[in-house]
Amino acid sequence: MNKIFKVIWNPATGNYTVTSETAKSRGKKSGRSKLLISALVAGGMLSSFGALANAGNDNGQGVDYGSGSAGDGWVAIGKGAKANTFMNTSGSSTAVGYDAIAEGQYSSAIGSKTHAIGGASMAFGVSAISEGDRSIALGASSYSLGQYSMALGRYSKALGKLSIAMGDSSKAEGANAIALGNATKATEIMSIALGDTANASKAYSMALGASSVASEENAIAIGAETEAAENATAIGNNAKAKGTNSMAMGFGSLADKVNTIALGNGSQALADNAIAIGQGNKADGVDAIALGNGSQSRGLNTIALGTASNATGDKSLALGSNSSANGINSVALGADSIADLDNTVSVGNSSLKRKIVNVKNGAIKSDSYDAINGSQLYAISDSVAKRLGGGAAVDVDDGTVTAPTYNLKNGSKNNVGAALAVLDENTLQWDQTKGKYSAAHGTSSPTASVITDVADGTISASSKDAVNGSQLKATNDDVEANTANIATNTSNIATNTANIATNTTNITNLTDSVGDLQADALLWNETKKAFSAAHGQDTTSKITNVKDADLTADSTDAVNGSQLKTTNDAVATNTTNIANNTSNIATNTTNISNLTETVTNLGEDALKWDKDNGVFTAAHGTETTSKITNVKDGDLTTGSTDAVNGSQLKTTNDAVATNTTNIATNTTNISNLTETVTNLGEDALKWDKDNGVFTAAHGNNTASKITNILDGTVTATSSDAINGSQLYDLSSNIATYFGGNASVNTDGVFTGPTYKIGETNYYNVGDALAAINSSFSTSLGDALLWDATAGKFSAKHGTNGDASVITDVADGEISDSSSDAVNGSQLHGVSSYVVDALGGGAEVNADGTITAPTYTIANADYDNVGDALNAIDTTLDDALLWDADAGENGAFSAAHGKDKTASVITNVANGAISAASSDAINGSQLYTTNKYIADALGGDAEVNADGTITAPTYTIANAEYNNVGDALDALDDNALLWDETANGGAGAYNASHDGKASIITNVANGSISEDSTDAVNGSQLNATNMMIEQNTQIINQLAGNTDATYIQENGAGINYVRTNDDGLAFNDASAQGVGATAIGYNSVAKGDSSVAIGQGSYSDVDTGIALGSSSVSSRVIAKGSRDTSITENGVVIGYDTTDGELLGALSIGDDGKYRQIINVADGSEAHDAVTVRQLQNAIGAVATTPTKYFHANSTEEDSLAVGTDSLAMGAKTIVNGDKGIGIGYGAYVDANALNGIAIGSNAQVIHVNSIAIGNGSTTTRGAQTNYTAYNMDAPQNSVGEFSVGSADGQRQITNVAAGSADTDAVNVGQLKVTDAQVSQNTQSITNLDNRVTNLDSRVTNIENGIGDIVTTGSTKYFKTNTDGVDASAQGKDSVAIGSGSIAAADNSVALGTGSVATEENTISVGSSTNQRRITNVAAGKNATDAVNVAQLKSSEAGGVRYDTKADGSIDYSNITLGGGNGGTTRISNVSAGVNNNDVVNYAQLKQSVQETKQYTDQRMVEMDNKLSKTESKLSGGIASAMAMTGLPQAYTPGASMASIGGGTYNGESAVALGVSMVSANGRWVYKLQGSTNSQGEYSAALGAGIQW
């Protein structure tokens, strides 16, 4: 049955005691202690009957960490426990456990030394700390710093907002970070680390798996020992994504570089942008892709697709299992294919071949590299036939091209070469060797021929026209007319000579420029009304082998180079605008010879007279030197007045001598020219007036070859002649196309093909094909069969007989014995060759046909060779042809038209100009020659539009002369001449004029040197005189007073510098060092850049200065530094000479010899010298303010800092201990007091790590180990002692802030709170019910006893009967009654023998070993009355008891309320529970539910936000997936597609871009996709597939 009881406080035992329900009790009053007692009572009611409520000491306290009065909702249980009271119950906190502190609002600190700082935070476990608002720290030494953070596990730390750290030593440092597992770390925002020692150290990083590492932002590492870099993803054990933006998926996969992807176990992507997908594959090159198990792509931009595929060459592609692309830019297609060579495509290997079928028509153009099929080759053959013209066609039976027929005036020809050979004989041809047209004519031994009827060519600087004989005759007449009056103008002759030399060189060089004759006729240009020598790509060309033309007034013959060379040579030796004098070259030669002699005689002495200025001008004469000697080369320009020296004149004379020789040669050449022109006509290309064409007939031959024809341009607009080699090449190409040993002989004869079918030979394609048809007539199935109707093999196939392509045809052998089929690429090559041969803009079309050429003949267009050749034959009317009647031997005639009038030959290239040249000369050459002559003459001579030269004008002494002779005569009168009698017979130039001395002006500055013999002019002499005058003044200024008396009195020297050496032996100063300066008697500056000033001064170190007599600078300043220090011997001044460049020392004395530096201004900069005044002021300042904020004023003994790293401040202060500090008068730190600090006058520290502060303070015990501290059960340790006084004098420590931590000092305010609490507790204890139990009976007994004592002890009502010891009342107001009774405590009562009262305000009726009953106690009524047993029994009757077991013993584990009848019972006035096993009241439950609801609501809101964000991100991801799913892809084989797509889902949107490609055979499909969504996230996908 149940026992009824109740729990009351027992002050004697200091705990709650179970008693009868009838027992009376008084409440324990202290702040919230009533609630606490109620809780304990409730807890007692829930515990077994008779147990003591010993859950812990009730030493907790409420603390208001804010301001104002305390609330009443706090709970603090445990010694040192503290709970913040706050202002109201809603903010109260709970602290349960030893030194537990619940500081934050709503906070809970449960466990020893737990500390809940944040609002609504929870700290569970030894030393757990929850500092962040609403944070949770669960586990020993766990720590939650961030707001809403959770730290679960020993030493776990959640430092960031909303962070979670779960696991031993786990650490979530960033906001929203999660660290789950032993020693995991999530360092920055949004980072996640899951697994033993996982580490996510950067923002948004994720490390999932044991020892996984996500070391950079946005890194994801999933799997044991994975690693991921910035924006990288590593999935799979030991997967490593080390490159930025890389991805590694699969066991041991490695993405080592930027933007790499490695997917598959052991896959490796080792270079930037590389992709490796498959088992054990490797992408080792930049931008490489390896797809397939064991595949490898090692080169730049390589792709390896397929098992064990290998792409090693840069930009190579290996597609198919075991395929290998080793060459650069190579492609290996198909399994086992090998591409070893650069820039190749392989579809097999040396033993495995594949066909390429279904080839579409390839583009056929100059830059096309498409494959060609059979139909295209046939189309090209047909096109060739059409372009050949002349009736050529494709044989419908055998596909060959029939020979063309070209009908020419000289017969029909069946190939282009033969037709061109006929045309070659009588046209003016290009000499390819000489690079010009050749007028040579004849077949066996062609000779030079005259070109007649040449119209006057334009004569200008830009003219390329041929000039005729009459034009050259006019030029020669001008030369003859200008010959007589050649004068002796030295300067002009010098210029003329130089130009002649240049002209001669140019003429000589022109001889070597003769080229080969081009294979084109010289044709009439209707637009320009002249023959045009344009050739090939050049607009102008030379005409060579031109026979000397007839040089008469009415001649229209073309002149050759030798004729013009003769003329030019004559012109070169004569000057222009010479008065009409001589009629023949012989006279000219005589005059030039006379001129040479005159110039030679005049040149020796010709210093010329300037009559306007009345002076000689210094133009120099000949080669010898005189008084005006070694004259520097004068400026040889038009305006120059410089004198010329002998070497310059020598050059001129040599040139004149050369001119004389050239003139004689030219005379001969001109004479020979007439004869040559007379004999020119024999070999010219003649005009056949009967047939209206130029004819190549020569001599007795009716037909002659025109050789040396350069390859003519073969285009639609070309009118070039075609030579034999071109025709031979064309025939050879056609023969090559025929095959069957078809060939072209060296004479152009075409040998037909021979085709062997079986054992029979066939000599044309038709018969050969017919034989082939017979051999296949019995073939069946899919064979290529002969179509008898069509007369050819038919590629028709299938029931409908559709035309089919014959594909995969390998390159057929091209040789005279080959019978291989050729493929499209070969046909394209043939077509290209044919197009090149045809020229005329012919092109190979995309379908293999050839676009017809266009040949322009006489401004008409022709689209085939036959028509073009016919046109050329017809247009020979406009060709430059051979005229057999011209001259004695015939000549090419430029006569044209019905009346055969002379015509201009235009576009004539520059002919060679030499003695042996027979080239035609064009107008520009003649103009150039005349221009050279005009330039050589000077005097503003110019070439007129008709080729003549205007006369020059020479101004000499202000008179004008129009020819060289008159000019030289004018010079002779006024020249500065050589006087052989002057200079004592040694000879000299004489400047006298008209017998009077004259000035020589315009003399250039002569060279002034020791070996110069140049004349100097007035300006130079004036400058010298001025310099002498200046130097005289400077010398006077420097020397000062040079009077002997002055020097004797003041010393020798210069202005302002004097030395008096009277009585001293001469001993000069010595500056021995480089850059050194020594001033003063016997001064020595030995060091480089050193200075010694003063008698006997000496400086022997570099840059040193010895200033003053006998001063010595010999010490080198070394770089170094030291600190200022204080020793027992005084202060050691520090220095630092390392902060700049060190120069030599300045010495003003010597060792043992000193000087004062007086009158020194106060220094102002860091390195200025200071004066005594400054030093005195500084010392004074040190005495008063030695250091800012530090002052000392004492005359006592100095301080001593003896210990290492010690500090001593204050008079007589001594610090002997290492690292000690002593501050104040007489402060002392003992040598044994390591780290001791003594602050204050006579403060002493004699213990390690101890501190004494204040006057006379002394440490007494120092550090202690395992000492017994007051009110502490466990032994304690200290590191040192802090003393603020001594045994003889103590100090108050005032203004102490309230302590909060376990080891903080507490102030009186805190102690008062404690005292108040103690007072309340004392009062409560005094009034407790259990202290007055049975008190009435006890008092009655006491009264009776007192009465007995009196009665027996002379007091009526008080008697004693004892011989024991006296009672002792020791406490104030105490009472001791009975033998040996002791009332030790204040206000205590010891009643009865041996009774002991040791507690204040108590009554004791016994001792701890001898107790007494208090009987006959009346029932208590008041709150402080004692209760008797009857009352207790009555109280117990309504109390709650523990249940009993079957054996009758108490069942402490069960309590049944309500009598066990099935009803319920309400327990009212239940105090709030504080311990784990305490019952909670409705208020606590309601508050807990509210807080749980609030926390749950908050977390749900947060979770909802996270879910909302997650939902948004997921929706964005789904939208991205939808956008990428919606991307269309290429589907046609060989096609590629770039696509864009969009997607939206649940309010989020995304856009995607994609690129896809289908392989040429349609089997492989590649896709690369990327997307971005409205959440700002990016995604990418890569795929490849094969279909069959």
From Swiss-Prot:
The entry's localization annotation reads:
Cell surface; Cell outer membrane
The residues that cross the membrane are: 1534-1544, 1548-1558, 1567-1573, 1577-1588
Cite the residue spans of the region called Surface exposed passenger domain. Answer: 54-1499
List the signal peptide residues: 1-53
Coarse class of the primary localization is: other
Kindly state which keywords UniProt assigns to this record, in alphabetical order.
Cell outer membrane, Membrane, Protein transport, Signal, Transmembrane, Transmembrane beta strand, Transport
The record's Gene Ontology biological-process terms are: protein transport
Q: Which GO terms describe its cellular component?
A: cell outer membrane; cell surface
Query: Where are the stretches annotated Translocator domain?
Result: 1500-1588
Induction pattern: Expression is negatively regulated by H-NS.
Q: Which InterPro entries match?
A: Adhesin_Head_dom, Coiled_stalk_dom, ESPR, Pilin-like, Serralysin-like_metalloprot_C, YadA_C
Q: How does it assemble?
A: Homotrimer.
What does the UniProt record say this protein does? Mediates aggregation, biofilm formation and adhesion to a range of extracellular matrix (ECM) proteins, such as fibronectin, fibrinogen, laminin and collagen types I, II, III, and V. Mediates adhesion to intestinal epithelial cells.
Q: What is known of its domains?
A: The signal peptide, cleaved at the inner membrane, guides the autotransporter protein to the periplasmic space. Then, insertion of the C-terminal translocator domain in the outer membrane forms a hydrophilic pore for the translocation of the passenger domain to the bacterial cell surface.
Q: Which family does it belong to?
A: Belongs to the autotransporter-2 (AT-2) (TC 1.B.40) family.
Name it: Autotransporter adhesin EhaG
Q: Which gene encodes it?
A: ehaG
